[in-house]
């Protein structure tokens, strides 16, 4: 069975954000606006998305 994934798009700039938020975006494989990353749907990835929820958008209707 295929592993579940989540697609995340960066919609906010990391400029003037805390260093931990910038590092979280890098951990999510996002470094420029409007880039999309497909990541495994794990609790750790979901936690990272929650930490920078104001800078990213989850695509494909998954919440």
Curated annotation (Swiss-Prot):
One of its GO terms (biological process) is translation. Pfam families: Ribosomal_L30. One of its GO terms (cellular component) is cytosolic large ribosomal subunit. SUPFAM superfamilies: Ribosomal protein L30p/L7e (SSF55129). One of its GO terms (molecular function) is structural constituent of ribosome. CDD domains: Ribosomal_L30 (cd01658). Keywords: Ribonucleoprotein, Ribosomal protein. InterPro entries: Ribo_uL30_ferredoxin-like_sf, Ribosomal_uL30_bac-type, Ribosomal_uL30_ferredoxin-like. Part of the 50S ribosomal subunit. Belongs to the universal ribosomal protein uL30 family. This is Large ribosomal subunit protein uL30. The gene is rpmD.
């Amino acid at each position: 069975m295929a592993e579940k994934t989540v697609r995340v798009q960066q919609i906010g700039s990391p400029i003037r954000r805390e260093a931990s938020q910038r590092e979280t975006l890098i951990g999510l494989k996002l470094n420029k606006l409007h880039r999309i990353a497909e990541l495994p749907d794990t609790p750790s990835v979901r936690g990272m998305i929650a930490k920078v929820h104001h800078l990213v958008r989850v695509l494909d209707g998954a919440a």
